[in-house]
Amino acid sequence: MKKTLISLFALFLAVAGASAQQLVAGAAKVDITPKESELARPTDIIRGNLYVRAIYVSDGHSATAIVGMDTHCHALEEVIRQSAASTGVPAENFIISSTHTHSGGTAGIGADNKPSQEQVQAAIVKAVDLAKAAARPARVGFGKRPLDLNVNRDNYNEFQEWEQAANWTAPCDKDLTVITFLDQEDIPIAVYMNYGMHPVNFFMSGVVSADFPGDACNLIEKVFGDKTVAVFSQGASGDVNPKLAYTEIFQETDQIKGVRRPHRATRGSLDLSTKEVSKEQLAIHKAMVDRKDEYVHMLGNAMGFKAIEIMLYDTQYEVNPAIKGAETIIAVPGRERIDKNGRENYDPGYTPADDRHIGVGLVQIGDITLVSVSGEIYTEIGLRIKHEMPTSKLMIVALADGPFESGYIYSNNAASHLTFQVIGSRLQPGHAEEAIVNAAKQLLKDAK
């Protein structure tokens, strides 16, 4: 009898060990900064390096790959296929997203950009490979705290016009959410940050920059002696900017003429071409870039130090969580804009179009849940997901994985806004919010 009990106990230990292996995590980054010779204009500058950063996590049975890039890459299906074949990470367990910097290359968010799409795709595959090769025993933890840097940017002004400007009473998610992977010496292997705020500070300025996400990541990596890789992802930021974005202090003028807010609403189109700065304007341009540089440093440093604060005081760590992943594609009725010549503050008219497809994914690391959406979702959609999902440790990652067919994904309440985001969206009103929220909830239900 005693022998039988010992045998049963040994069997129990073996089964328990098989189902609860030590978590391992690794991280890496690959430089994708363009060369100075690739800059589009002689007056353009490179403010700092651009990276693809990756985190690999495995529980011994399954794995996930989390990637952030300081540029954009829309052809991710083939990248995921290649990386899945190389690393063994299931395709549904990838979260690849852009930091959404508007200055992440020689053409910003334009098509003719360096780094090229091919360079970015290769860097993603390489970064995940390197992250897996660096994997070591780890603990994982989740934390969040409010960080008051952002503001809703859908504003109906005193002239009864819609414009892109600070709206202090509209919804805005202030949570900075952080997932940390610690090694056995309590050094962060990787830090995954999430915050909703557009990195638009160097948009159309001729400056190549990762903007505040890059500054935040660089700070954390520097604090921990470059033993850590920090990755940034966007939350629900479709209608959110930094508080001082596009204000008078960042106008290219020879003298700041006070603290009034410029009147920005426009019916006309926006010229997205960046021109060479003239010799006469160069000093003024450099002064503006210097002001933006200081502001971006402040945003990045505030975010980076707040993330470290969260890691120290608001995070409980787990050793052996299980990893799960799932994804779905939802179809939302589409529309085609008739008048495409204006920017905002008018109704362009629409005709019905084919359905637009939006990817919704879910990755779980123990009791931590990451929901990904393949578009720029409005704040109210993100807040609704947080409110209705039956989990407290939740991160919402926007601009992830694809397909990228929708344009901005505005909330039901924002359907009447004549901002450039809403009138440019390829989605009919009243459908996307419900479909995304329900898809996320169903994925979580199916995972249990």
What is each of the regions a protein language model found here?
Residues 6-7, 123:
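Short amphipathic alpha-helical "recognition" segments used for binding
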